[in-house]
Amino acid sequence: MLRIITGTAKGKKLKTLEGEATRPTSERIKEAVFSAIQFDIEDRRVLDLFAGSGQMGLESLSRGAASVMFIDSAREAIEIVKENAKTTGFSDKCKYLVSDYRNYIRKASGREGFDLVFIDPPYAMKSSIDAAKRLLEAGLLRAGAIVVLESGEDEIDLSELSSFEVIKSTHYGKKSFINILLYKEKEE
């Protein structure tokens, strides 16, 4: 059972999609991620790409984030996120969209950016790097944005993301690599 770890919604239980379609981030990994970014959450605009149950975005709201945009290509996932937002009392700070990440980024290009982004695609997709590059190219990352990439069994090649500084890169068990990156806007 997923739950909010700390903050204003501490202990609230979250629903998740049944079956193998989604793979929620484990509580151990979630705790490690939020421990690493704890001072970079309050009043931030958050993007939860590949939202699944929405637990990463909702945990951010519980810890003081201003708002979260949840994107998932599965309508069922977004419906679960909406239920979880209602359970935690954060519905008014949430926006939701059923969309493929590429389409969302293309359509959102040039709009107001995000301060904190969670990119956790299904492991088979191997699209963490592609999503981060597209967000950067579309101007959807604010200077100093934190990007959390979760990937499967293989470490991902971060050399394509030269505009980012690696804050933390950790392997959890046999199936999860977490990379926490800081976007450093290039000076003109």
Question: Which residues does each PLM region occupy?
Answer:
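Class I S-adenosyl-L-methionine-dependent methyltransferase catalytic core
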Residues: 1-188
